C-alpha cells in the first residue's frame, strides 16, 4: 500500500494513537477518532512527503498495520481451535464419514495453497530473496492507486473468509455423508512446477495423517502474501522504482486472483449440492418402513396425542369440580340459615304466627320436592316470656318496672333469639341509693340526742314531710320531679320494712292506739334505733355502767378468790424451796465436819462462825443468812446430835462454840 495514499479512517483508534506516538505527535488523552485523523493529516502526512523522514514514518506505519494483521490472524486461529475442540467432543461419526471429511479438508487446503502459490509465482525474485533473508519484517503494500489497493486486499480477505466458512461448516455438520465428494480440478489453476511438487508431498502426507483444525488453521495462517520492506534507508528513487514494480505485479496478479475466486465458489456450490443429496437420501431411508410398523407408530402417536390432550382437560375438570364442591359447602349452609331465620321470625310467639311463603314454583316442579324437605325443619312457635306483652314478628313489650333483654348470642339480630323481661336495674339502684341515704340520716339524728337513748321522737327522729323536702332538693340534675316522686314511694315502703326503723303517725290517741287515717295524706314520723354513729364517750358511759350494775358483785367475789389462791400457792412454793435449801446446807455442813476430822494435820473441829461463813458465802442478804443458819443449825442439832460433839473454846478472851464429828 502506498503510504502517501493511506486513508487514516480505515485504521483503528489504537493504531492511530500508536502512529502518532511513534512520530512524536502530541494529542489529548480523551481524543476521539476524528481528532486523531485530523492530527494524522496535519503532522504525519507532511513527514511522509518530506524525503529525510519518510522511511521512519513508513516503518512506524508498517509496524502498526502488521501488528493489527497479526492480532486478526491470531483471533481467527483461536476461534478455529475452539470450534474444533467443541466439535471433536460432540462427534461420534463412522469411519466412512471421517474419510470423506479428510478428503474435503485436503481439497480445501490444496485450493488455498494453489491460490497463494500463484500469487507468489507472479511476484519478483528480488522480493523472494528478501523474504528469505528477513521473514519477520512487516509486509509492504505495492504502490498503486487507493482504489486498486483496497480492491486487492478486499478480494484476498474475502477468499480467506470463504475457506474458513467451509471449514466451519464441515466441523459443525453432524450428518453422515454417504458418497465421497469429487476433488477440485486443479489443472484449471495456473501454478508453477515447484508448487506442484510441494502440493504432491502435502497430499501424500495427508493420506497417512489425520489433520485436526489446529494444523489446518496454522497452515492457513502461514500461507499469506508477505511483502518485505527495504533493509536499509532507501532514497526517493528506490521507493519510486519499488512502487512501479509493485503496481505491475498487482496488475498481473488480479486476473489470477479472480480465477481462483471463481474456482472456490464452484467448489462451495458442489459441496452444498452434495450435502443436500446426502441428507435427502438419508431421510428417505429413515422414512422407509414396513406397513405394520407404520400403522403401529401411527396408532401409538395418536393415542399419545389423545392422552396429552385429555390430561389438561381432566385436570381442569377436577379443579372445577373441587371448586364447585367448596362453593356448595359454603353457600348451602348460608342459604339454609337465611331460610330458617325468615321462618323463625314469621312463626314468632304462639298465637301470633304469620302465614308462611312456599318455595315451590309452578314452572319448576323440582322446587316442590325441595319445599317438602324443608318443611321438616320448620321451627315451632315460642311461648311468651314472663312479664311480657308479645306480638307478631317476635316483638315483645315488658310490664312497668321491667325492660326487654336480648340473648348474648343474638349478634345484633342476625340470629333471631327470643327476648325476655328483666327488672329495670337502673331504677332499683336509684331507689336503693335513696333508701341508704335516708337511713343514714336517721341514724345520725338519733345519735345526736342522749347517746341514742332519747324518748322524744321529734328530737331523735324526723317527719316524712321534712325528709321529702331534704332529699327532693338534693336529687341529681338529670332526675325529674316525677321520677323522684315514684322513687320516694318505694323508699317509704322499704323503710317501713326495716327492723331498726320506728315509724308512727302524727295523729294518734293518748292511750297509744292508732287511729284510722281519715285521708291518704297521713304524715308519719320516722326514727332509727341504731347506735352506729354514737360517740365513744357515750358508749363507755353507758356500757360500763350497765356492766357494773349487772355483773359487779360476782366480779368482785371472783377476783378475791383468785387472789387468795395465788397467795396460798406462792406460800407453799416458798416453803418447799426453803426446805430444799436447808437440806442442802445440812448435808454440806456434815461433809465439812467429816473432812476436818479426817485431816490430821489440822484441828479436828470447826467453829460455828467458820461453818456459817463457808456455807452461806453466796447469799448477800444478812437477814436471809441468819434465817437460813438458824434453821440449818436447829435441824443439825435435832437430827445429828449423837454424832456431833459440842463444846466451848476460849481464844484471846473470846468464847467460841465448836463442833466436832464423832467417829
Curated annotation (Swiss-Prot):
The modification Phosphoserine is found at residue 123. It is a single-pass membrane protein. It is found in: Nucleus inner membrane. InterPro entries: HeH/LEM_domain, Heh2/Src1, LEM/LEM-like_dom_sf, Man1/Src1-like_C, MAN1_winged_helix_dom. Residues 124-134 have a biased composition (Basic residues). A motif (Nuclear localization signal) lies at residues 124-137. The chain crosses the membrane at residues 317-337. Residues 91-123, 164-183 have a biased composition (Basic and acidic residues). One of its GO terms (cellular component) is nuclear envelope. GO terms for biological process: nuclear membrane organization. Keywords: Membrane, Nucleus, Phosphoprotein, Transmembrane, Transmembrane helix. One of its GO terms (molecular function) is chromatin binding. Residues 46-188, 267-289 are annotated as: Disordered. Its main location: nucleus. Residues 47-62 have a biased composition (Polar residues). Present with 1250 molecules/cell in log phase SD medium. Interacts with SRP1. This is Inner nuclear membrane protein HEH2. It comes from Saccharomyces cerevisiae (strain ATCC 204508 / S288c) (Baker's yeast). The lineage of its organism: Eukaryota, Fungi, Dikarya, Ascomycota, Saccharomycotina.
